[in-house]
Amino acid sequence: MIQLRSIINVADNSGARKVQCFKVRGGHHRDIATLGDVIMCSVRDAIPTSSIKKGDVVRAVVVRVAREKRRKDGSYIRFDENAVCIINENGEPKGTRVFGPIARELRDKNFLKIISLAPEVI
């Protein structure tokens, strides 16, 4: 569960390390984001040589959440941390690598490029 003002790790090599959520896309007065949701973030920590700088406003998709999420088959999925991947306006990732496991729910939301870059899909 990602709330407003949550500090989140970045799971790709786009150049940002940590971002802060300030808007959850997809509805009026929507305050909580979960797996596969698109959020607007401000970069809080970045690699010095990257094109993404501290303070930049970026769009990101949630790929891991620490709160358990119930799947349709009755099983639950949860991760050790909250993580996002930075995307552009078309929904394609800005980075060329994705680190760590990715939830299968991203396939249902048509983030297939992120799924193909991930080392493991759970």
From Swiss-Prot:
GO cellular component: cytosolic large ribosomal subunit
RNA-binding recorded as keyword: yes
InterPro entries assigned to the protein according to its UniProt record, in alphabetical order: Ribosomal_uL14, Ribosomal_uL14_bac-type, Ribosomal_uL14_sf
Keywords: Ribonucleoprotein, Ribosomal protein, RNA-binding, rRNA-binding
SUPFAM superfamilies according to UniProt: Ribosomal protein L14
One GO biological process term: translation
Protein name: Large ribosomal subunit protein uL14
Naturally occurring in which organism (per UniProt): Elusimicrobium minutum (strain Pei191)
Top-level taxonomy: Bacteria, Pseudomonadati, Elusimicrobiota, Elusimicrobia, Elusimicrobiales
